[in-house]
């Protein structure tokens, strides 16, 4: 319990009620996933009681996990029904992958920093999310051997949408990615593949993410 006598499950429910619902997150499956996944298991031990605060939390190696609202917003934008295969770029601590795994059939998650990839595997195994596959690689190139994906979620800001990710998106699938300046504001875009050559784009507003590094990202 924290100093006010609240346990983390109470704080998790309050996060959903006070942070997500008032900001328009309405997909019941997303709200249930956010209430069910123990975010405190995906942050450093000394930050467990900050896990549900309305801001990003540092996880080491100069990286953070996004605030709960952003994770929920990106998950909701994918419109997952439960049978999808999803690509998650920027595993971090594994938290977003766990949320996505609660909403989809299978998740493939890529992390470029070996130490974070190893810790994410431990976090996901410990919390029972065995349907998440984690590898250490350049996320801007996707996971071609596992493609196509019904959803792709990118947790880092890109200068442009990587062509490899668009190519690995199934027809009817959705790609959610922040695009904009390095270290500044980005637009959170949702790109839907309409056919082999046609895509539709919508914006979910301004966000601020760490830069997406890699061959098709920032150098």
From Swiss-Prot:
**Is Methyltransferase there in the keyword field?**
yes
Q: Which GO terms describe its cellular component?
A: cytoplasm
Q: Where is the active site?
A: 66
Q: What is its EC number?
A: 2.1.1.77
Question: Could you tell me where this protein is found in the cell?
Answer: Cytoplasm
EC supergroup of this enzyme: transferase
Please write the reaction equations for the catalytic activity of this protein: [protein]-L-isoaspartate + S-adenosyl-L-methionine = [protein]-L-isoaspartate alpha-methyl ester + S-adenosyl-L-homocysteine
Asked if Methyltransferase is a keyword of the record, the answer is yes
Q: Name the Gene Ontology biological process terms.
A: methylation; protein modification process; protein repair
Question: What keywords does the record list, in alphabetical order?
Answer: Cytoplasm, Methyltransferase, S-adenosyl-L-methionine, Transferase
Q: Which GO terms describe its molecular function?
A: protein-L-isoaspartate (D-aspartate) O-methyltransferase activity
Stated role = Catalyzes the methyl esterification of L-isoaspartyl residues in peptides and proteins that result from spontaneous decomposition of normal L-aspartyl and L-asparaginyl residues. It plays a role in the repair and/or degradation of damaged proteins.
Extract the NCBIfam families matched here.
pimt, PRK00312.1
What family, per the record? Belongs to the methyltransferase superfamily. L-isoaspartyl/D-aspartyl protein methyltransferase family.
Listed name of the protein: Protein-L-isoaspartate O-methyltransferase 2
Its lineage reads:
Bacteria, Pseudomonadati, Pseudomonadota, Gammaproteobacteria, Pseudomonadales
Gene name linked to the record = pcm2
């Amino acid at each position: 319990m924290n100093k006010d006598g609240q346990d983390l499950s109470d704080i998790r429910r309050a996060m959903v009620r006070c942070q997500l619902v008032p900001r328009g997150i309405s997909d019941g499956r997303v709200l249930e996933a956010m209430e069910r996944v123990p975010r405190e298991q995906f942050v450093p031990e000394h930050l467990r009681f900050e896990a549900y605060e309305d801001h990003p939390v540092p996880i080491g190696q100069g990286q953070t996990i996004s605030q709960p609202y952003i994770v929920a917003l990106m998950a909701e934008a994918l419109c997952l029904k439960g049978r999808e295969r999803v690509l998650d770029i920027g595993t971090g601590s594994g938290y977003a992958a766990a949320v996505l795994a609660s909403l989809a059939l299978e998740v493939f998650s890529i992390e470029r920093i070996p130490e974070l990839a190893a810790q994410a595997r431990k976090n996901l195994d410990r919390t029972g999310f065995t349907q998440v596959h984690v590898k250490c690689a350049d996320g801007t190139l996707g996971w071609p051997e596992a493609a196509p994906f019904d959803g792709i979620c990118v947790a880092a800001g890109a200068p442009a949408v990587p062509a490899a990710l668009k190519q690995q998106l199934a027809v009817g699938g959705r790609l959610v990615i922040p695009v904009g300046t390095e270290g500044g504001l980005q637009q959170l875009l949702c790109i839907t593949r309409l056919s082999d050559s046609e895509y539709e784009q919508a914006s979910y507003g301004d966000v601020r993410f760490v830069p997406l590094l890699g061959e098709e990202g920032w150098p």
